[in-house]
Amino acid sequence: AGTPEDEFMMRLQGRPYEEIQEAGGGIVRTVRATRMASEEKLQDILRRNIFKFSRYGSTTAEIKSGYGLNTEEEIKLLRVIKEVALETDILIVPTLLGAHVVPPEFASRRRKYVDLVAKDMVPMVHENHLAVFVDVFVDTGAFTLEEGREILRAAQELDMPRKLHADQLGE
């Protein structure tokens, strides 16, 4: 649905991510577009991308959620990944990235969103076998180290493998 290709060019030209975000771009713009897309549209987009992967010889792809940023939408994205994975010879490794950024509707309630990810999203994804990994984005404008620890502890308690990507944007 939403893609950040135009923002990639801005980053190559030296524009800081914060400036792109303030101009209405960034992860939140992609979240809005992704939330509006139907499962069928998301499946079509994913099928096209996987076809490109296979054409270039890829045999494995980790595919992350992270553009729904609420339980219902993150589950929708992981279901799409799981369904399309059944149609391809490429090994698809789904990853829950519900802790990508705090969505705008939780901007003044960060604590509530961290709880939602740790106590609602992670257990539901685990129970329904929708993801292999749980990932957290710890960086400026994303999650703090302590918030990341809390979410990853929730995954650890369920024996889900954990990932962290950090300092992607920070100086």
Give names to the regions the model predicted.
Residues G26-R47, F51-S54, T59-L169:
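Metal-coordinating catalytic core of metallo-dependent amide/deamination hydrolases
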Residues A1-I45:
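Metal-associated gating/positioning segment near the N- to mid-region
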